[in-house]
Regions:
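Catalytic machinery of carbohydrate-active enzymes
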Residues: 1-188
Length: 188
């Protein structure tokens, strides 16, 4: 069985948020999945060692507009996917999947404008798999650095792809100070 998951959000954080749901679909159908993602998600770098991922397809600008619709449809059609899971409510991706000859298309309800990213993905995936899904992401990284296991190691991602996702630098400083005060923590 060949499965495609479409996750068209821009950021690295967005991709990581969706990982538990991507993994759950892979496990449910006992097969690796292909992902259609934006280049800016860095999926090719982050997921190169992920045992649940077969192939990463990049959703770039040449797949925009009418010409892009047909180009993307042909790219999907060539791969002969059996199922497509669309993590958004876009009519465009629904039509692309159907135009590509995919028989089973699963997607959020069409035309939904307001959306809680984690809640919607969790409900969608739980409906598909019939199981409760943990929201804890798991990146399969090839080389693990030697870290002291008695210390919490925290990385702060202080940039974001969209203005609505950005937090003032002073907030990060206060967060780091509070964490340092209450937990044995090392910032990496």
């Amino acid at each position: 069985m060949k499965i495609l998951i479409i996750q068209q959000r821009y950021g690295i954080g967005d991709l990581i948020i969706f990982l538990p749901y991507i993994h759950a679909i892979s496990k449910k159908f006992k097969t690796k999945v292909s992902l259609l993602v934006k280049e800016s998600s860095k999926a090719s770098d982050l997921l190169s060692n992920d045992k649940n991922i077969d192939e990463i397809l990049i959703l770039d600008k040449d797949k925009d507009g009418i010409k892009g619709f047909f180009k993307l449809s042909n790219e999907i059609k060539k791969r002969k996917f059996d199922k497509v899971f669309i993590f958004n409510s876009s009519l465009r991706y629904n039509l692309i999947a159907k135009f590509s000859g995919v028989k089973s298309v699963f997607q959020y309800p069409l035309f939904r404008s307001k959306d809680n990213l984690v809640h919607s993905a969790k409900i969608f995936t739980e409906n598909v798999t019939g199981e409760i899904i943990s929201t804890e992401p798991n990146l399969n990284i090839k080389s693990i650095h030697e870290f002291d296991k008695n210390i919490k190691h925290v990385g702060l991602g202080i940039s974001a792809s969209g203005l609505t996702k950005r937090w003032d630098i002073q907030n990060y400083i206060r967060l780091a100070q509070e964490l340092k005060k209450n937990i044995n923590v090392n910032f990496i």
